[in-house]
Amino acid sequence: MAISSTDRRSKNVQIFVEKDAVETSFAKWAQPGHFSRTLAKGPKTTTWIWNLHADAHDFDSQTSSLEEVSRKIFSAHFGQLSVIFLWISGMHFHGAYFSNYSAWLTDPVNIKQSSQVVWPIVGQEILNGDVGGNFQGIQTTSGWFQMWRAEGITSEVELYWIAIGGLAMSAIMLFAGWFHYHKAAPKLEWFQNAESMMNHHLAGLLGLGCLSWSGHQIHVALPINKLLDAGVAPQEIPLPHEFLINRELMSQLYPSFSKGLAPFFSGHWGEYSDFLTFKGGLNPVTGGLWLSDIAHHHLALAVLFIFAGHMYRTNWGIGHSMKEILEAHKGPFTGEGHKGLYEILTTSWHAQLAINLAMMGSLSIIVAHHMYAMPPYPYIATDYATQLSLFTHHMWIGGFCVTGGAAHAAIFMVRDYTPANNYNNLLDRVLRHRDSIIAHLNWVCIFLGCHAFGFYIHNDTMRALGRPQDMFSDKAIQLQPIFAQWIQNIHLLAPGTTAPNALATTSYAFGGEVVEVGGKIAMMPIQLGTADFMVHHIHAFTIHVTVLILLKGVLYARSSKLIPDKANLGFRFPCDGPGRGGTCQSSSWDHVFLGLFWMYNSISVVIFHFSWKMQSDVWGTISPDGSISHITGGNFAKGAITINGWLRDFLWSQASQVIQSYGSAASAYGLIFLGAHFIWAFSLMFLFSGRGYWQELIESIVWAHNKLNFAPAIQPRALSITQGRAVGLAHYLLGGIGTTWAFFLARAVSIS
């Protein structure tokens, strides 16, 4: 029988959702631990509450159905988006209702941003410092004001509307999370359709996202910012929609608008170069990247991503197949190459998450560096407190995401990896020579650690002996970072060849002139010397040790010479049972636990380096005669070459603001500094003591309760080894980060 074209088309249409998959039951949700038969019985011991928290989001432990796990993750993503939109709404509401945004717009260099006013209840109104522009409030360092300026927002009313829009989106996302789990739940094959997912994410999310952003920048942000830069008062600038509907108004600012779309369809795209520019450098009025460069950048990205979103094969039989690409990827020394990876990435969400976390973490760290080297928003470069906050924020996020990537890679190895399906592919070959990888990485860590700290110990010793001529320094035995200086020079000179029409360098960090806004330095060439060379090798050391610990946790997740059957013990286990001494702290979870301490070390050194370097060699003022005065007077090169210098000239010297903050608007930072130190010290109680100690203590406390006929119905238990470590780690990181935050903010607010 001949099949008509209509019939053939209908065969392509597949039903990818299941209707009314799971009943909506508030009664079920109200029962703690409803997702687990054991937990649903209720608590018998205090361990129950810990297991409840540990397993609530461990969907693997709740069901063996990959489809059900996929649906739960998908629904949870909508919940996450709902929270994000609610947060964005709250930020804009604060800007609309509690902020000095309008005043800041009139004088962004001298007026500080504030979007929170503390109520006078028991004297906390002391926190409302004078931020300028007849406004008292807490100085914020989030960068929202600069971003709003870049978007073309000129009044608090517009912030109100965005806040309302954010609330609406939050509600829609919440509804979508419920709808796509309970009413129309996608089937497993929908989640596993990698080609369709790539097309939609590339063309839809990234492509159309970039296109809509560049459209907003061209039609709304550019004209408004051009008028603001020219000194027009915000209240005199037309409303955003007028630039959209009034071409005459736009063509006064950008003459090519009068020509409409004719240049586009005739191929004379150069006509649009008045608003799609390739200038390079920074806008001298605002100290930020040229918004017309940013619009051009996003338009180009939109074109690339929309093209990329048509690359993969779906219903039409043309384009790439992800499986074919992966399986064709093999060389003479790589065995089966990438064979089997497609199956891993479509059946293990832990494998997907591991890659995505590693990528997003790396991207966050890249963003941290771009924020100061190429400041994207108007007046953000001269707001030193915000620059320091954003750098620190993105570095911490990057560190946590990369560590999380290793955690989920290890969970994948334990729960989802099937050796038989990966025989002689790249993953299998890496696992087979893991001893060589870890041994070499261990050697690198020892080399870097001994040499990097050796430089400092040498310098501290020579300084103590009064022999400055024998120290490693720019004035004695030089250790110049010649490769870094060479790369800086290449980046400074290359645009002259690769982008001959650009007006300035990509980033003034590489070289060039000093960019100042209102007498404050926005950016200038960052000179590198011996002190940078030395601390760079501390960075290399701490990062390599973090990688060593995390990679060992992944490569030995399933087995090791010590514990051959490790895969059977799971992702987290305290020891390999009684009678096997020396097997504690060998689970993949324990590797993540240890790796997080080293991640904390790594990021701390990076943010300390950044903070001191920028205050010493970049941030400061420039007088009309061109003389530059840096905040700490260029003391990094001399102070950062000894351990004592780091302690005295950075930590102790710059802690004066937080230590002496009492009775001032910065006093909250003094309290946080003390409180966070306490939280950090509290963590040591969990990290340095064993479970038996606490169980014995609990037994005696329970005995006392029994004597008074006051015994609890739920039996108290000491935390397990793993639980104790988790609590200790959480407080260690929270305390450490809180201490650093208070130290940085009290200092930064005083110098900006």
From Swiss-Prot:
Enzyme class at the top of the EC tree: oxidoreductase
Listed EC numbers: 1.97.1.12
Positions contributing to chlorophyll a' binding: 677
Membrane topology of this protein: Multi-pass membrane protein
Transmembrane segments: 73-96, 159-182, 198-222, 294-312, 349-372, 388-414, 436-458, 533-551, 591-612, 666-688, 726-746
Function: PsaA and PsaB bind P700, the primary electron donor of photosystem I (PSI), as well as the electron acceptors A0, A1 and FX. PSI is a plastocyanin/cytochrome c6-ferredoxin oxidoreductase, converting photonic excitation into a charge separation, which transfers an electron from the donor P700 chlorophyll pair to the spectroscopically characterized acceptors A0, A1, FX, FA and FB in turn. Oxidized P700 is reduced on the lumenal side of the thylakoid membrane by plastocyanin or cytochrome c6.
Name of the protein this chain belongs to: Photosystem I P700 chlorophyll a apoprotein A1
Organism: Phaeodactylum tricornutum (strain CCAP 1055/1)
Organism classification: Eukaryota, Sar, Stramenopiles, Ochrophyta, Bacillariophyta
